[in-house]
Regions:
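Alpha-helical solenoid repeat scaffolds of the TPR/TPR-like class and their adjacent stem/linker regions
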Residues: 1-323, 386, 488
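Short, glycine/charged-enriched secondary-structure capping and boundary segments
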Residues: 92, 96, 130, 280-281, ...
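Short beta-strand segments
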Residues: 162, 266-268, 279, 291, ...
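PAPS-dependent sulfotransferases, especially Golgi type II membrane carbohydrate sulfotransferases
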Residues: 165, 177-189, 198-264, 311-325, ...
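Conserved nucleotide-binding/hydrolysis micro-motifs of P-loop NTPases
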Residues: 294-295, 357-362, 414-415
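Adenylate-forming
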Residues: 332-338, 390
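Short, well-ordered alpha-helical microsegments
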Residues: 337-340, 418
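Conserved phosphate-donor/acceptor-positioning beta-strand/loop module used by diverse small-molecule
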Residues: 343-366
Length: 492
């Protein structure tokens, strides 16, 4: 017969075995993640959560994976749980700040990053990310200080050099400039790190008006980037053509509701002047700028998945209402140009503004942009030209069919004669004129696009004709464009 002591020892052993098993599984999940075996790590993370293993590392790492997969809301919940379990885990504040930034919640993102810095003052990446958020909020001098600190703490942090290279440049920046152009900075750098450095060098040389040298680094950067993120033009083309065919199908009987919200869609190519346009329109206090948000395509896909049981307009408005209660919104997901037919046919009280500029200025701006995600074609001048022409062709078809619904906004004319062009736009929108539309640089909204610095300055025409400084580099794009009769004059 076993005594009470034996029973207690047996219980202790079971608990010890259970604890040992728990940490064995957790460590296995963490090791798989560290080795880049994400699908296998995911299975173990999910198992750990199902078993109730309250280890902050599980919640944190699982959240990071989901963020990278675009599952932002679930990722936010997991990272917050990690912070709850271990309030002094600095990486969780960094990751939560990045997630909140993706969600457009810049103020809370700033607080998270300041908390990370409070916990770990020498955390270079936290200073870098704080700088990015401050830049989006228009606090450019403070952003610069954060970038300086990041470089001071970690002189080989390549993304910090790119970020600071997008701000105003002066003689005070000589120290980090020398580091940026040193041979040592490229030692043992990944391809991604090299891309950051080459783009940063190109930006500085551009500011110094050394355009030939800037061209060399732009080509190095984009060639490497294209290897990392190849682009399939045929797949891109197929999607545009498929949606063009959808226009001919009558999806539903549209009902124009007098009291329904006003939905303004800004479409065109990236770097076409759309951020300036959105800043102008959102000077109206009754307008909410949704920014670059892909909720129209999400609504369309949900409509298709529901086998047409739901209405596209209802799905879209439902998503808008989660963002704002204001009655007028701008949606600046530029690739909605592919959906211009569906917008015109299916979204009540919708207006489309097609923003465009000189194709070579647009292509140069794309090639210089260094987008962190999407827009893979921007690393190839040939693909930039092809996509530009395809976008123009698609929009001409939609304009012929929905002429009254689509406004043409020429960026070059806008910045050359803002008073005339903005008054014309506001009149087309049916709004009363306010002089504040002429001062979009005073708009206090957060801007998370590549134009976040330029748009903080008064309207100017400095970028018009900038392509001429890069004429030799742009020859591949020029050859594609001039196959179209419309652009033959560019050769002269």
């Amino acid at each position: 017969m076993r005594g009470f002591g034996d029973q207690n020892n047996s219980k202790k052993k079971k608990i010890q075995n259970r604890t040992s098993y728990k940490y064995k599984i957790i460590n296995l999940a963490l090791n798989l993640h560290a080795k880049g075996k994400i699908p296998e790590a995911l299975k173990y993370y999910e198992y750990c959560l199902n078993q109730g293993f309250n280890d902050y590392r599980i919640f944190s790492n699982y959240g990071i994976i989901l963020k990278n997969e675009g599952k932002i809301i679930k990722a936010e919940s997991l990272i917050r749980k990690a912070i709850e379990l271990k309030p002094d885990f600095v990486d969780s504040y960094l990751n939560l700040g990045n997630i909140l930034q993706d969600l457009g919640n810049f103020k809370d993102a700033e607080l998270c990053l300041r908390k990370a810095i409070e916990l770990k003052p020498d955390y270079a990446e936290a200073h870098l990310n704080l700088g990015n958020i401050l830049k989006h909020l228009g606090q450019l001098e403070d952003a610069k200080l954060s970038y300086h600190k990041a470089i001071e703490l970690k002189p080989d942090l390549t993304s910090a050099y790119f970020s600071i290279s997008t701000l105003q440049y002066s003689n005070e920046d000589k120290i980090w400039r020398d580091q940026l152009f040193s041979d040592e900075i490229l030692n043992k750098k990944s391809k991604k790190g090299q891309v950051d450095i080459y783009f940063a060098r190109a930006n500085i040389l551009h500011k110094e008006k050394k355009y030939d040298d800037s061209s060399k680094f732009l080509q190095l950067a984009n060639n490497l980037k294209f290897d990392l993120n190849p682009f399939n033009y045929e797949n891109f083309l197929k999607k545009s053509r498929t949606l063009l065919l959808e226009m001919d199908k009558k999806i539903l009987k549209k009902i124009e509701l007098k009291n329904s919200s006003e939905n303004i869609f800004i479409v065109g190519m990236p770097r076409c002047g759309s951020t300036l346009l959105e800043s102008i329109i959102s000077m109206n206090n009754n307008v909410y700028a949704l920014g670059e948000i892909n909720i129209l395509e999400e609504s369309y896909l949900e409509y298709k998945e529901s086998k047409k049981k739901k209405r596209i307009d209802e799905l879209y408005i439902e998503k808008v209402n989660k963002k704002t209660q204001l009655n007028i919104t701008t949606n600046k997901w530029l690739y909605n140009y592919r959906y211009a037919g569906i917008i015109s046919d299916e979204i009540p009280n919708s207006k489309i503004i097609h923003c465009y500029r000189n194709p070579l200025d647009n292509i140069l701006s794309l090639y210089r942009a260094h987008f962190t995600k999407g827009n893979q074609y921007s690393s190839s001048l040939v693909n930039c030209a092809k996509v530009y022409l395809e976008q123009e062709k698609i929009m001409s078809i939609y304009k012929n069919k929905f002429q009254s619904k689509i406004y043409n906004l020429n960026y070059d004319l806008l910045v050359s004669n803002p008073d005339k062009e903005i008054k014309s736009l506001i009149s087309w929108l049916g709004w009363n004129w306010q002089d504040l539309y002429l001062s979009p640089h005073q708009n206090t909204r957060a801007i998370a696009t590549r134009s976040s610095v330029e748009v903080r300055s008064p309207i100017n025409s400095k970028s018009i004709g900038g392509w001429k400084n890069y004429r030799e580099m742009l020859k591949p794009a020029l050859e594609i464009l001039t196959q179209s009769e419309k652009y033959r004059k560019l050769l002269s």
